[in-house]
Amino acid sequence: MKILNLGDWHLGVKADDEWIRGIQIDGIKQAIEYSKKNGITTWIQYGDIFDVRKAITHKTMEFAREIVQTLDDAGITLHTIVGNHDLHYKNVMHPNASTELLAKYPNVKVYDKPTTVDFDGCLIDLIPWMCEENTGEILEHIKTSSASFCVGHWELNGFYFYKGMKSHGLEPDFLKTYKEVWSGHFHTISEAANVRYIGTPWTLTAGDENDPRGFWMFDTETERTEFIPNNTTWHRRIHYPFKGKIDYKDFTNLSVRVIVTEVDKNLTKFESELEKVVHSLRVVSKIDNSVESDDSEEVEVQSLQTLMEEYINAIPDITDSDREALIQYANQLYVEATQ
């Protein structure tokens, strides 16, 4: 049996942005086409199907229904675990959008509790977001499980949320009994020991620029996984001056950031030609105008990320979850600005 595995979808992201929705539709179509060619009728989605925790719009609800119907028409059953973005409250499993909006469909199976599922003789644990309410239940399930494989929405230490941005979280030792652990939650692909973060099926922000995205096929008979890259990297970063010959059509309908390290007479034309085809264009100057200093006085230097975190931690009268979200957002902006 072959299973298609897909990371976080984040339906409704950026206030139901139509361009992002087009990216998601394109990715779903690619996955369906691959499934049809390879006889796949089972998908596992790794949580965060939805993006906005507390205000899912009618447009997002409609979009989710259309996707589920498209999957049903293709003969595909979707297994999905509940991620933190699917929850109304971060530390309580209910209410959650996946259960409320998707569980009613016959071809969708929502997992809001740790569950061992038999996929043609291959036992896989499907484990939702671990929070204050269900930590004991999840740890006990893992301790007594006979499954060799685990799908989760884990927040583990030492992996990467975005390329270049290391995560903080639980040490992954409690998962060592599994042969392989696959996880959503972090958006870039990374792995260590028996844990692999599979990444999102498509790029969503500038923090994803030039970062491979796609989906994964797992064969329960051979226990082999294969990465199938998305045909399009929707967020691209290029450097100017551009080395070699550029075909501007390659950037049609993409979000492009140009890092300028030198200004010459052709820069204006370069920007103009890109503007004709791209979805959005950002030009960032990285020209080094620094001047060497003879000042030998020692100065204590802290990283910008450390300073941002200290500033956010000093903000009064905000909840711990809001503080954590602000730090994560600030780190994301830092990655976008420095890559």
From Swiss-Prot:
Organism from which the protein derives: Enterobacteria phage T4
Instruction: Look at the named UniProt entry and state the broad enzyme category this protein falls under.
Output: hydrolase
SUPFAM superfamilies assigned: Metallo-dependent phosphatases
InterPro entries tied to this protein: Calcineurin-like_PHP_ApaH (IPR004843), DNA_Repair-Maintenance_Comp (IPR050535), Metallo-depent_PP-like (IPR029052)
Which BP terms in the Gene Ontology apply to this protein?
Answer: degradation of host chromosome by virus; DNA repair; symbiont-mediated suppression of host gene expression
Q: Which domain of life is it from?
A: Viruses
Enzyme Commission (EC) number: 3.1.11.-
Name the lineage.
Viruses, Duplodnaviria, Heunggongvirae, Uroviricota, Caudoviricetes
Query: Subunit comment for this entry?
Result: Consists of two subunits: gp46 and gp47.
Q: Name one Pfam family in it.
A: Metallophos
User: Which GO terms fall under molecular function for this chain's record?
Assistant: DNA binding; exonuclease activity
Keyword Iron-sulfur present in the record's keywords: the answer is no
Name of the protein in its database record = Exonuclease subunit 1
User: What family is reported?
Assistant: To phage T5 protein D12 and to yeast RAD52.
